[in-house]
Structures are given as structure tokens and as C-alpha cells.
């Protein structure tokens, strides 16, 4: 199967909720994909195929998943690729010494952490999450990968809200599996 055919089938499983969590947003819930093992496998296969095509000569060493929805498919993708999985968590959730990065949210700021010994310097890393909106949390994860002195190859997202221009904040190429939302909902 091609990436486009995987995406077409996966898109049919999404549930849409207009004006959630705020006015102008069409929330596309991708959780129904995980209720169907066949669709979940196709989600993983689509990302794996993309990464094999995008980086045929490069060994990927780690998948870094953002709390919390990056945890839903990041470990399974890492397993399918035969690489390690490393979580980026909210402050205070990881033991030991951690690097920290702040990001802005709608109502203030938040802090992400990654363990200092999680990834050896020079490792090749892919960051995954469910959606890119404003790009703040993904940019913070990218900053953490830089603090580890690893090579951030790409950000991978299931979906994207294009009109929020989040990818402009990111320091590496972006791949979005499912069709992006080009504009906000009309009021």
C-alpha cells in the first residue's frame, strides 16, 4: 500500500467535533483508530513506510514521543522500526536528572522534560505526536533533543492545523500523515 492509500483509509475512522476545544477548531479525534487493530497496524505501517522512504540511507536510533498522545503510537512505531522509544514528559514525572524546555500554551506556559541519559549524543531521532497546532510543545521537544546533542531528523504528526502555522516554529522537516486543516471553521 502507498502512504496515500493508508491515509485515505485512516481518515475515514476519524470522528469530528466542531468548535472543540475552542471556537473555530474542528477537532478530529483519532482515538477510534486504536479501537481497530487493523487500522492501528495501518497507522504504524504508514509512518514506517514514510520513514523508510524519507531516510533510506540513515539509521534511525530513537523515536521520541510527546506526553501524552505521542505515547499512544510512538512505542509501537519504535518497535516496528527496531529502535528505542524515549518519552518527553511534563515536569516532575521523570526520575533522575532531566533537561527542561518551556513552551507556551493558550493560558500560560508549561514545561517538558527528558532524562539527561536517555539518548546518546549523535543519535538520530524522530519526534512523534498526534497533532501539530501552534507548534509550542513540539518545538520544546526539539529543544530537548538539541540539549541531548542528538540529530533531529524529522517531526511526524498524525494531523496538522495548518492555519495555526505551527511548523514555522520547528527546527526540522515535518511530515503529517493525514490531510491537514487549511483554515479555521467559519463562525
Swiss-Prot record:
Record-linked PROSITE patterns: PUR_PYR_PR_TRANSFER
Catalysis: reaction(s): AMP + diphosphate = 5-phospho-alpha-D-ribose 1-diphosphate + adenine
InterPro entries attached to this UniProt entry: Ade_phspho_trans, PRibTrfase_dom, PRTase-like, UPRTase/APRTase
Alphabetical UniProt keywords: Cytoplasm, Glycosyltransferase, Magnesium, Metal-binding, Nucleus, Phosphoprotein, Purine salvage, Transferase
GO cellular component: cytoplasm; nucleus
Residue numbers bearing the Phosphoserine modification: 68
Binding site for AMP: 133-137
Primary site of residence: cytoplasm
Pfam families, alphabetized: Pribosyltran
GO biological process: adenine salvage; AMP salvage; purine ribonucleoside salvage
MF annotations from Gene Ontology: adenine binding; adenine phosphoribosyltransferase activity; AMP binding; metal ion binding
Obligatory cofactor(s): Mg(2+)
Function: Catalyzes a salvage reaction resulting in the formation of AMP, that is energically less costly than de novo synthesis.
Note: Present with 11200 molecules/cell in log phase SD medium.
Subunit structure comment from the entry: Homodimer.
Record family assignment: Belongs to the purine/pyrimidine phosphoribosyltransferase family.
UniProt protein name: Adenine phosphoribosyltransferase 1
Originating organism: Saccharomyces cerevisiae (strain ATCC 204508 / S288c) (Baker's yeast)
Taxon lineage: Eukaryota, Fungi, Dikarya, Ascomycota, Saccharomycotina
